[in-house]
Amino acid sequence: MAGVTDVQRLQARLEELERWVYGPGGSRGSRKVADGLVKVQVALGNIASKRERVKILYKKIEDLIKYLDPEYMDRIAIPDASKLQFILAEEQFILSQVALLEQVEALVPMLDSAHIKAVPEHAARLQRLAQIHIQQQDQCVEITEESKALLEEYNKTTMLLSKQFVQWDELLCQLEAAKQVKPAEE
């Protein structure tokens, strides 16, 4: 009796699944799709049997899939002598990598130091300092531009004063020359 109810529950679940997949109309044409796929496969087989090149390609596809398999190299048996030659050829590289690995292992305790663990705190402080530095750079640029403007004004003023003093000097020289000429005439 329990087996019958299990079968009925399974049947109900399958019907619900079919409604989800195929919609409320039921399994419309599920056999037609399968039949269509079989027909396509038979048609491809007939076409392939008529053409020699296609037959050869179908045979080569299997080989290609086999060669593209990443485990294919693992299946090929490499003699121990060849493996030894590979290892001996890379001996210096392996030794240098071992030395580097030993250095890394020696430096591992440094990674557990309080300085490294405090990096997040320092990063936040560094970010704030970087922002302050950028603001100060902007202020420095503004001050530099203002200083340049003031120096240009100073240079213009100095140049005008210099020209004015030269003109006054020339005028004074002319007046002194005219004054010296008058007493000589009397």
Curated annotation (Swiss-Prot):
Residue stretches spanning the membrane: none
Quaternary structure (record): Subunit of dynactin, a multiprotein complex part of a tripartite complex with dynein and a adapter, such as BICDL1, BICD2 or HOOK3. The dynactin complex is built around ACTR1A/ACTB filament and consists of an actin-related filament composed of a shoulder domain, a pointed end and a barbed end. Its length is defined by its flexible shoulder domain. The soulder is composed of 2 DCTN1 subunits, 4 DCTN2 and 2 DCTN3. The 4 DCNT2 (via N-terminus) bind the ACTR1A filament and act as molecular rulers to determine the length. The pointed end is important for binding dynein-dynactin cargo adapters.
Keyword Cell division: yes
UniProt organism field: Sus scrofa
GO CC terms: centrosome; cleavage furrow; cytoplasm; dynactin complex; kinetochore; midbody; spindle
Biological process terms in GO annotation: cytoskeleton-dependent cytokinesis
Keywords: Acetylation, Cell cycle, Cell division, Centromere, Chromosome, Coiled coil, Cytoplasm, Cytoskeleton, Kinetochore, Mitosis
Similarity field: Belongs to the dynactin subunit 3 family.
Name of the protein in its database record: Dynactin subunit 3
Cited InterPro entries: DCTN3 (IPR009991)
Residues that bear N-acetylalanine: A2
Top-level taxon in the UniProt lineage: Eukaryota
The protein's role, per its UniProt record: Part of the dynactin complex that activates the molecular motor dynein for ultra-processive transport along microtubules. Together with dynein is involved in spindle assembly and cytokinesis.
Subcellular location: Cytoplasm; Cytoplasm, Cytoskeleton, Microtubule organizing center, Centrosome; Chromosome, Centromere, Kinetochore; Cytoplasm, Cytoskeleton, Spindle
